[in-house]
Amino acid sequence: DHDHDHDHDHDEIEHAWFVPEKVSEVAKEIEQRAGGSASEVTKRMDAVSERLGQLDHVHLAMTEPIAAGLLYGTELDDVTPEQYARSTLNHTDPSIDAIAAFIEVIEQGSLDFLVVNPQSTNSATQRLIDAANDNNVPIIEITETPPAGTNFLDYIEEVTDTIERVVAAAEPKDHAA
C-alpha cells in the first residue's frame, strides 16, 4: 500500500479546467457575479470526482500532464518518470535519458494506460506512443479543448467514461510500489 495523496497543488496545475473542484469554483463565482445557477455544473463535477474516486488502483503515465487535475487524489497512480514530467512542465524537450526511462516504464509491463494529448506531440511523444502500441498499453487521448460541437461538461464526462472503461479492462498487474 502506498500514499495516493500526491502532494500536488491544484493551483499549480497547468490545465486547471480539468480539476472538477476548480470548475465548480469558477461556476459559483460566475453565479455570484453574473447570476444564473452553478448547481448543474457543481452536480456534474461532483459526479465526475466521485466516479474517478471509485476506480481501482492502476498505473498510468502521461506524455504531458493534461489529465493531472482529474487524476490526482484518486487511486490512479501517475508513474511518469520525474525527469520526463519535469521537462514537460518546463516546456522543454525531454532528454534522451528521460525518454529512455519512460520507455522502460512502458516495457516493464506494469503500466495500465498512457495519456496522450494529440494537440501537443513531438518526436519524443511519438516514440512513447510507439512503445505503448508495441507493448499493448492502451492509449487515452485527451485534448485541451472539447471537439467541435461538444459541450465542455459533456467532454469531461466523456473523458471520465473512457478512463473508467480502460481501468475496468486493465488486467491485474504486479504494481510494485
Where are these regions (language model features)?
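Extracytoplasmic metal-acquisition and chelation regions
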Residues: 1-177
